[in-house]
Swiss-Prot record:
It holds the Pfam family ThiG. Its EC number is 2.8.1.10. Its main location: cytoplasm. One of its GO terms (cellular component) is cytoplasm. Homotetramer. Forms heterodimers with either ThiH or ThiS. This is Thiazole synthase. The keyword Protease does not apply. It comes from the Bacteria. The active site is at K95. CDD domains: ThiG. It comes from Escherichia coli O81 (strain ED1a). The gene is thiG. One of its GO terms (biological process) is thiamine diphosphate biosynthetic process. The lineage of its organism: Bacteria, Pseudomonadati, Pseudomonadota, Gammaproteobacteria, Enterobacterales. GO terms for molecular function: thiazole synthase activity.
Amino acid sequence: MLHIADKTFASHLFTGTGKFASSQLMVEAIRACGSQLVTLAMKRVDLRQHNDAILEPLIAAGVTLLPNTSGAKTAEEAIFAAHLAREALGTNWLKLEIHPDARWLLPDPIETLKAAETLVQQGFIVLPYCGADPVLCKRLEEVGCAAVMPLGAPIGSNQGLETRAMLEIIIQQATVPVVVDAGIGVPSHAAQALEMGADAVLVNTAIAVADDPVNMAKAFRLAVEAGLLARQSGPGSRSHFAHATSPLTGFLEASA
């Protein structure tokens, strides 16, 4: 089980809502992957209408909604969006995203830390999307973030765990859950993240743009389960040298 703030999740796979061909396909994929925490961009929903094409099926599915501030370029914009989300959806949970450059969508570390500290003080449960910077992740933890969400690679790039070395440090030193977010392109990437110690992964593009999103969602569910089970099973240590599994020395000597 995964514990974040005041909630417990059986699934270690979180999903997004962008890029799906239809709301129906989105919900089917979410159900197939078993995700219990789903992000949605505030700029994509009509907060005045709970029968919004994206919002209504998510509410009906019974998942925990994690509104995000995607599109915000400054701490002030993110804080404003956070308050709109809390008022409209009745949740203190927030995925904090601040990326000023639309080409690379890389998170702004200075604005993210600034916004996170303010939002925590205002009663939000903040899960910040951030670069794979161990120092920044520790600072975000220290100001009260409920989890940290370092990137594996740029959003939507499907490149996998390009920041693996830094992710390992973040995981080793964290005392809050670590959710690898962005860049995960295939199920094996998700399995690797769980194997190395991440508490969860957030996947959107890789599922939504697949030829068969529902089956891809199932594949990610199985990969996350496999990665977690592998870690819990205690994998053997790596070695630079070979270690025979079936020594033949005694047999050969006896036959000589």
